[in-house]
Amino acid sequence: MTDLTHPLERLVQRAEILMARIEAVLPQPMSAPDWNASIAFRYRKRSNGRGGLEPVRHVATLGLNDLQEIEGQKEKIQRNTEQFVNGLPANNVLLTGARGTGKSSLIKACLNEYAPRGLRLIEVDKDDLTDLPDIIDMVSEQPEKFMIFCDDLSFEDGEPGYKALKSILDGTVAASTPNVLICATSNRRHLLPEYMSENLTYKHTEDGE
């Protein structure tokens, strides 16, 4: 009788090697960082194409009282952030205006103001917005509140990041989670000027908020 033990073992070994190679190239679940390492994190793509959150070691110690001559915008953003950290309905935020008008500083000052109450910030580059569903899925069960921050945002026709962001806000890709707020800044009043009617649904005021 022919002994098939050794050929079968070799076949199993080859199958295991093949599966290991396949798993190496398949997308892996995003691993959570040490949430106690910082109040702010950056999303970064690694050389293998996988993304992850890196803690920001030195967060600017900017406070709301340090920001002058933008009292109207500051009051609205602070009120919206207050509602967010209290678990009440809050609006996603788009701050528009020329460079140097304090848009990013206002977001960072709110972070410092409300970090003791569990507010955290995750900065995501425009090119990585297609990974938003994975980021939201990772933080959805965390007790903290997360502002997902996109700085200096604008799109050209056909960019995948625009559709990804719009899908998140419309709830067509990932269900809205109560501990996630999208905050963005832009030099443009409309993120996609060519199709103003399809722009993201934000509430604008005359002061650019």
Segments predicted by a language model, with ranges:
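Walker A/P-loop nucleotide-binding motif
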Residues: 87-109
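N-terminal pre-Walker A segment at the start of P-loop NTPase domains
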Residues: 59-82
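AAA+/P-loop NTPase substrate/partner-engagement loops
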Residues: 113-146, 152-158
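Interdomain "pre-motor" coupling segment immediately N-terminal to P-loop NTPase/helicase cores
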Residues: 2-55
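Short loop/turn elements that form and flank the Walker-type P-loop nucleotide-binding site
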Residues: 88-90, 117-118, 141-144, 176-179
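Phosphate-binding P-loop
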Residues: 56-58, 82-90
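Alpha-helical scaffold elements adjacent to nucleotide-binding pockets in ATP/GTP-utilizing enzyme cores
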Residues: 106-110, 131, 135, 161-168
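Conserved catalytic/switch belt of AAA+ P-loop NTPases
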Residues: 140-141, 157-208
